[in-house]
Amino acid sequence: MEEVIKVSDLTRKYKDFSLGPVDLSFPKGFATALIGANGAGKTTLMDIICGITAKTGGTVTYFGETDNPDKGNIKERIGYCASQAMFPANWKVRDIALSMSLAFDKFSKDRFYSLLGELGVTDEKNSKKPLSSMSDGMKMRVFLASAFARDTDLLVLDEPGSSLDPLMRDRLCDRFRDYIDSGNGERSII
């Protein structure tokens, strides 16, 4: 089975925490969940995969090619949604749309706003609020829309349903299926 990400002997050491060594792979064309106790290192692992946090040792192979998330078009191929603040607290929806369109070639503002509509964020009241005044669930909807509005091969989502109500979690599961199905076996979710 082809792998979208392969992690070998991966370690990350902090003062009070050590991750690894970790050896695992994520298959292409599937949604794979990382399950573990709070504080086990799931977020750290995802941050390393996305190039947000540096690894102490080991390798991460992306799409069978490289161990460097900054090389080539790797960052264009990976969409990321954190469980915490991804953008400055004073930003509004329009600021996020602008920054994402400048940062990523394959970000669609039209798709972003359409997804916000599906997720119930585009009413006048919510779309003009700064992130700091949105509920956690509303912020997560904005973060998810920003990730799904990019044309990527891999989505890395950190606890995407944790702050969503049951209806929004159902919509999120539908979005996962649509994303995987639209990739003809080439798209994956972690």
Listing of model-derived features with the role each one plays in the protein:
Residues 166-168:
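Helix N-cap at the start of a conserved alpha-helix in ABC-type nucleotide-binding domains
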Residues 83-142:
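ABC-family P-loop ATPase nucleotide-binding domains
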Residues 58-74:
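Conserved ABC transporter NBD signature motif
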Residues 50:
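Helix-to-loop junction immediately C-terminal to a conserved catalytic motif
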Residues 155-159:
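Catalytic Walker B motif of ABC-type/P-loop ATPase nucleotide-binding domains
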Residues 35-37:
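The feature captures the beta-strand-to-loop junction immediately N-terminal to the Walker
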